Amino acid sequence: GSMDVLCMDKTGTLTNESILLEYYMDVLGNESTRVLDFAFLNSMYHSGVCNPIDNAILACQTMPGRSAYYTRLLAQYQKTDEIPFDYARKFVSTLVTEADGAGQLIIKGDIAHVVARCGFVEYRDAILPMDEDKMRSVASVVDEMLQDGMKVIAVARKRIEKQNRILPEDEQSMILMGYLAFFDAPKKTA
């Protein structure tokens, strides 16, 4: 389920010029606004270069009736730290803190690189250890979306108590939450 090269049509010659967020789902493939919320916080609070994937995620705040919800979500979580995206790691990490000082480390990016840092998986509101069966389930859901021409990224989290800096060592034993799937539709004339 990993991708080494993502080709995007920046000129709009072959595609409709914008990547759209098609699905936000848990590890079983069910729609999950919780996965979208954590991806939104990661996209909003990282300071890296603006990119089409983050733009598609951030556009969720313009969905009908969702603007006030995302305003409240941003008020609930404040950015504390980040480790920017780089092409070796293939994901971005942000640490957000709630009013009580407890934090959530959120990573978002390449499926293989994110899953490699996960020791747990979130299944139906339960946190379970990642094992071979769960890895096969993850691969099955992701492979189906990739075969449909989607770009798929993973979202994972980990609760961090009262810490205001994150280090690469913190990006272990993460909890895989789910996926985001994007589509850049080809033009009918392409």
Model-derived segments and spans:
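Conserved cytosolic headpiece of P-type ATPases
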Residues: 1-190
